[in-house]
Amino acid sequence: LDNLQDVDVAIFSACHGTPYKPGTASHAANAPAAIREALSWYSSNPEQLDLDTMKPVFSGKTVVDCGDINGSTTDGSANRQTINRTTKDILLTGSIPILIGGDDSTPIPFIEAIASQMPVVIVQIDAHIDWREEIGGERFGFSSTMRRSSEFENVRKIIQIGGRGPGSARPADLAAAQAWGVKFFSPVMFIRTGSLLSLTPFLKMPI
């Protein structure tokens, strides 16, 4: 992280967030490695033209992968502190941080770090809405990501796309999200409207 002054985007990954069962590795602990493998072609061919945008893959931007940060299967608090500190360190260089998880508890300290320095609009794409207050006494697990994020002062707007089916929330969770002002866009809404353009009014709302 000491040489990012001229870097546009800095990627780092966290294999472990806040476990519900300390000592048990996250179901998504291997995700960073899998994502890097899947994207290896793009990183090795940055000069290739992307016909969707009609621009080179990285469009002249400098992107650096900082690798995995240290994590623990037993100490969620330490993991959160490391993610938070790493994010702030990257922001201090002027680079844009991108976090690769890890389960859905890893964004909590990431969003907290960004929100400590600037207004934030969250767009979540997930089958689950993650508004549980706690599970088994743990308030920072992967089922509470959006609720915890909503508590950060600079989070101005939350749009959640893709929530579906049973198992995503209880009535109280949905009520809390709606009371906060979350805008939901479910697959059913997409089927009815036939277009993601129905999101446009949400995205154009003032921050």
Name each region found by the language model.
Residues 1-207:
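Conserved alpha-helical scaffold segments that buttress catalytic/binding sites
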